[in-house]
Amino acid sequence: MAQRIVSISAAPYDGYAFPQVLDSLAACGVSHVEPAFIVGYTEPFDESAFTPGEAQQYAKWLSASGLGCYAFSSHIDLGRHDAVSVFCGRMDFAARLGAKVINTNAAARRNEAGFFNNIKVLARHAEQLGMIIGLENPGDGSDNLFNTAQDGIALLDAIGNTNVRLNYDAGNTISHRPQSRDGGVNPAADALLAMPHCAYTHIKDVRAAADGYFFTPLGHGDIDCAAILRALAATDLNCSIEMPLRLHRAPNAQPQRKPEPVPRAVLEAAISESLAFACRHLEIASLTQGVA
C-alpha cells in the first residue's frame, strides 16, 4: 500500500494569508494542505480568486513550502444555473495546484434536476483533468441530495460515473442529522457505511452542547474519530483533518464565525495534537490488521 496522505485543511487558518498557513503547517510537520474556499466558512472571495495567475502564485507558494496539495475544498450547490462555469474554473485552479480530489456539496433537493444535468458535464471535465469530484455531506441541517450515507450511495448509483465519489465528513453529520432526532444517524457508523464509496474523507471532531456545536482537536469531541481512523487504515483512502476553530454552529446548525482569527499558537497546538492522534490510531489499526 502506498504511503497514506494525511492532509490538514486550511480552514482553521481562516483570516491568514496562504504563505502564513503553509509556514505554520510546515512547523507542525505537516506534509500536505487542503486549501479551503467555502462561502460563509472562510474569508469572503469571488471567482477572481481562481484565475490562472492566482493558481500560478499558489503553486509557487506550495513549491517553496515543500508541502503538497492532494485535495481541495470549494463547496457550491452543483444544481445552480451557473455551476458548470463556476465549478469548472475551480477545478482547473485545483488541478494546477496538483489536487487529485476536489470536494464540494451536492445540491439542495430543490435543485435536483439542475444537479443531474450539471454533474454530467462536470464529471467529464474531472476525467479530462485526472481528478475526482468528492461530494460532501453538509452540516447546516438543510435538505440536501446527500444528507446521510444512504443518500450519498444512492446518488452515486444514479450518477454512474467513477469520477464522482463521496467525501464523507462525520463532523458535519452530528449537526446536520443529529442522532437524537427523526432521520438522525450515528456519525461514525454512517461514516463507515459511506467509506467504500469514498474517494476521500474528512476527519473532524465536534462537541455537541445545548448552545450549539463546537469544533475540537481530534479525541476531544463526541465523534468516534478513532473508529473512523481504524476503519480507514484498512483502505487506501487519503484523508484530511479539518478543524475550523474560528467557527461554531448554533443549535440550528448554522455556522457562526468569530470576529478575529484564531491565534497561530492555538492552531499549531491543536493541529499537532490531532495529527498525532490520527497517526497513532492509523498505525495501531494497521498493526492489528497486518496492513503494511
Segments predicted by a language model, with ranges:
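Structural motif corresponding to the early beta-alpha repeats
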Residues: 31-120, 124, 128-132, 172, ...
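Glycine-/small-residue-rich active-site loops that bind phosphorylated ligands and cofactors
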Residues: 13-14, 79, 109-111, 140-144
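Active-site-proximal beta-strand/loop segments in catalytic clefts of secreted hydrolases
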Residues: 11, 105, 136-138
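Histidine-acidic metal/acid-base catalytic patches
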Residues: 1-10, 14-32, 59, 63, ...
